[in-house]
């Protein structure tokens, strides 16, 4: 049996899921004393050693034995091993997972495994992880595997250069982009008014998500990144809630009063802008060809497969926030994924829009190139103050001249280095016809429901 240990993942709750500067969550795999099967072995599932039972309350991402037998990150799945990818309770597959994998096998898809859901979430699991949807995710992963691997390699290389005291700078070979007269494609009507978004809304909480959508704000950021604690249970709940919201069908039943709360009609509801997980986060409950799928691919692909056509037809999307982007090559990757998705789902080119969060010091030097790469799919750029400041710690932590003072007193938009960053983003966006939006303010609108004291309001003026 193979034992997996996952490190560098934050489990402290909403708002702490994948903070700025988080390094990639690597998986280290080592054979257990019982002896691990090797790639290519024909395995009789009944002969495999029993899995140790764990408490249903155990954190999915705690790093304990996940119940995955015979494969690890980067290790090809044995040809006879298809139905042994267990849920976090260490039991045999649930009927929902069994049906899913059998359906995939009937489609001649043998290299995809998805963890079983908690029993109480089987209906939602069936609704989100349909065979066609999972096959779509897998196809996306295979298509972009090479580009993603190269992107992650370039990140490691850049970090090594920074550790060697290299400093970032503006790119000399992209002068033609910076001197060109291009602009982004016109924005859809629903993105023309960007005064207020409610940000970092935890997706697993249907009541809070509905409160945000019905609040009267212009937009809602449904957050699978910083506002998401990526346990398997919360991920299933979050994906189902967001997909239903994107379809305009999300409801919540108050357990005390029995009242059923529904979304307002599209014209009165806030526009949904989902934020997939950042590139450094992996979804350890789904594997394609023996490799853990990136969380960003799972979030984006499932939302688009189930709700992309509906959002486009109704004029309410599909719109996304793209977080933790560091270079224009990463923006190009997102643009390629958008274009591929539009082709596969028979959507008009450019209908998917993405707002890139410039929340990393490296990205601030390539903001114009990032906007250029996404110009057909751009919904503008966003300034994330706290993540941007944190990126100085992540990238220059070994250099004493970059030590920051007390952030509660001195690190704000009045600081010179923060003003320079903000003004650069505004200048670029205004020149290129793109919205430049601001960061989050922890305030509640007057008369807001006090049952949601942690529901933040984000002010995002086009002119900041």
Where is each model-derived feature located?
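Intrinsically disordered, low-complexity regions enriched in glycine and serine
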Residues: 14-22, 61-64, 68-73
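Intrinsically disordered, low-structural-confidence terminal and linker regions
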Residues: 6-9, 80-114
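Serine/threonine-rich intrinsically disordered cytosolic regulatory regions enriched
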Residues: 6-10, 36, 42-45, 56, ...
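Conserved small/polar residues in nucleotide/adenosyl-binding loops
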Residues: 1-2
